[in-house]
Amino acid sequence: MRLSSSSGSVLPAQAASPEAVEEQKCLNSELWHACAGPLVSLPAVGSRVVYFPQGHSEQVAASTNKEMESQIPNYPNLPPQLICQLHNVTMHADAETDEVYAQMTLQPLSPQELKDPYLPAELGSANKQPTNYFCKTLTASDTSTHGGFSVPRRAAEKVFPPLDFTQQPPAQELIAKDLHGNEWKFRHIFRGQPKRHLLTTGWSVFVSAKRLVAGDSVLFIWNDNNQLLLGIRRANRPQTVMPSSVLSSDSMHIGLLAAAAHAASTNSRFTIFYNPRASPSEFVIPLSKYVKAVYHTRISVGMRFRMLFETEESSVRRYMGTITGISDLDAARWPNSHWRSVKVGWDESTAGERQPRVSLWEIEPLTTFPMYPSPFPLRLKRPWPTGLPSLHGGKDDDLTSSLMWLRDSANPGFQSLNFGGLGMNPWMQPRFDASLLGLQPDMYQTIAATAFQDPTKQVSPTILQFQQPQNIGGRANTLLPSQILQQVQPQFQQQQYLQNINETTIQGHAQSEFLQQQLQRCQSFTEQKPQLQTQQQQQESQQQQQQQSQCMQVPQHQQMQQQKNMTNYQSVPNALSPFSQLSSPSQSSPMTLQTVLPFSQPQSYPDTSMSSLSPSNTSTMHNALRPFSSEAPSHLSMPRPTAVPVPDPWSSKRVAVESLLPSRPQVTSQMEQLDSTAPSIPQSSALAPLPGRGCLVDQDGNSDPQNHLLFGVNIDSQSLLMQGGIPSLQGENDSTAIPYSTSNFLSPLQNDFPLDQTLSSADCLDESGYVPCSQNSDQVINRPPATFVKVYKSGTYGRSLDITRFSSYHELRRELGRLFGLEGQLENPLRSGWQLVFVDREDDVLLVGDDPWQEFVNSVSCIKILSPQEVQQMGKPFELLSSAPGKRLGSSCDDYVSRQESRSLSTGIASVGSVEF
């Protein structure tokens, strides 16, 4: 019965007698896998696997040298692939031949388990693979009784304990254990001409006891416990005569099919035996490996591929081939089966030794087009807004969980199976609908129409005096940082007020109701306009008197110097409210944009008044844009003063605007009044950025008015003040311009004025297109590539690696495998399950190998080695990335802006913050 068990019979679990289990003691996993071969890896206990009855029949046919006869009954209820739970794995070795085989206990999944949206995490530990070993095929001299075993010099120095070369000749005694725990003693000596490593005394006894012949292989392993292990791997010799006590080939085929069909119909456990040396291919593979190959890789006829094969002395080599067809191996008995469904043609002349058909999970296509993104729940490139339905009213769980598995039309079991964690179909991702946020799809067209309807109301740039550069050299700049913070405080309160109303206004408000509310608030604001004008005139007169008295104290040469430096400054009305540009409506229709965005008559401003709060005299375009701004003017673009040395970014930004800000009481009083009458407008109703920041920017610094036409209105790019939601028009190439935002003033006030948590998360709208970049953003983008890159792996210390030493991904993977003891596993992630990911300069986590090599070298920040368990655990959102030391989600404006600027990527709809391993 021993041969029948090892050759692949199927037994019910309850019928597994003690005779079938030859050894109760646990075998060494390293030695067992070394004897099985470098391409063999048993699935972990507790994991989900896919069992192929076709492959099991091939093992029986290879062991008995007899194919399955046609008269064997068919089992229509047995699917071509059976998804099972692996309950137990026992490694065995034949006591006489040392032939290794494994006993597996499987149980088909129930219909309820097939509907689980997530693949459970693998609880069992992976079988240990050998790392420090060598294998040699025996020659005729190695098996002779009067000779010894010649060990290659490099292998002896790598595996055997070091010799004492002070002795003559250097020699030592080695004690090695085989699979059954038997100890074998050998004398290791370094002698001969030329000198070589030999095993002499005890070797002939071992060869005779194991009945080794030329062509068999012997392998030695030095494990972590400083023990020497010994194993053998016999050459494949087909048996010509089968023992009479062994079951016939037909009986074995019928037995395995009947047991599998019974287990599939009753959801009962059954036991199989897997012989890795006799089976042509693995017929029990992990479910994740099967899904990745079948549903995540698209192949076609004519595509080139490569496949791993075992060669002499336990080495591995890739052979190239071409896909010549895709069809069922046995369409009559096993329709719609993925077992050996790919016809291939091999390049080399020795192709006759290889199978003409292979399975999808055995090959590695050279040019692959993934059907889904990579199986990692990374960050979304475009975060989904908070509070909105995912797919126009669909359930959020349908998108936050991963996409349901692609259905198999021929298998009812696969039709109900959902596979989670392997990404989202790109064409299934939701398209953002502006109507959900209360935005009109033709908002830009409406604004353009209002600007061209009445050419007489188009204002010349000369009328917009607050946009023109003014000579303010005679004004004193005595504002302190505390005064600046007090000025910004009302703006921040107003912004926070609008953010709080966003959640209640964004749901259930129709567009007509929103416009009517705007109209009512605009009218109430217009009624308060005379009072604001009276206060403005009083404050202007007081400000003029103070400025005249202060100018008398400033030396004349300082005034000239200030006048020279400040000539190019743009005058900025820092306290302008989004609704300060509105006047009385000229029409009464609440459904037209002209009612909400009326025209105002041009007025002139005094030269000494920089930031008046009277109704603005801006162009129609400004009147149209300002009411839709969701925050106070905070993004200013202005030159940096060259006469004042500043040591830090805060000082540079403070000094740059100190001379342009009005006095504190004026701004504070005006903003308090505006804050009390601030209309309740959803923040999400702000206009999206105008396409292309460079289209309105004169990069050469020229002030050609024709280059600044916006909807028929001349706009000077150097003096234009852009409110929140519109990018700065300052030229990017201007070295004296600094990006300026409210976050730079609010950094000391983070504890007193925290941002709304909805903005602090990564689930809010992506404003990377219209939120100005922070001051250090250009430094990050233009930063030179680092020479040394940190490499991380769970359970080990991180290593620094100079990636400039390598010229290809293959060299990098090979070096990483050597550093972390993963030789041969990082080169083929499809088979081993180990994955390499890296974090680029923009904090995106990407797969190593997807980009051109030079682009990868220039953008890599750090590298992370993920084990197969980590790859499978990443199928659940936040599970692995949240455990990594990442950037903490703060509540400051700087953190918010930097998060919005960072690009994000994810396969699931759930988004996380910036990731740093």
Swiss-Prot record:
Example of a GO biological process term: auxin-activated signaling pathway
Region annotated Disordered, chain positions: 571-649
Compositional bias of kind Low complexity: 576-594, 604-620
GO (cellular component) term, any one: nucleus
Classification via InterPro entries: ARF_dom, ARF_plant, AUX/IAA_dom, B3_DNA-bd, DNA-bd_pseudobarrel_sf, PB1-like
Keywords associated with the record: Auxin signaling pathway, DNA-binding, Nucleus, Transcription, Transcription regulation
Domain notes: Interactions between auxin response factors (ARFs) and Aux/IAA proteins occur through their C-terminal dimerization domains III and IV.
Assigned protein family: Belongs to the ARF family.
Name the UniProt record assigns to this protein: Auxin response factor 17
Taxonomic placement: Eukaryota, Viridiplantae, Streptophyta, Embryophyta, Tracheophyta
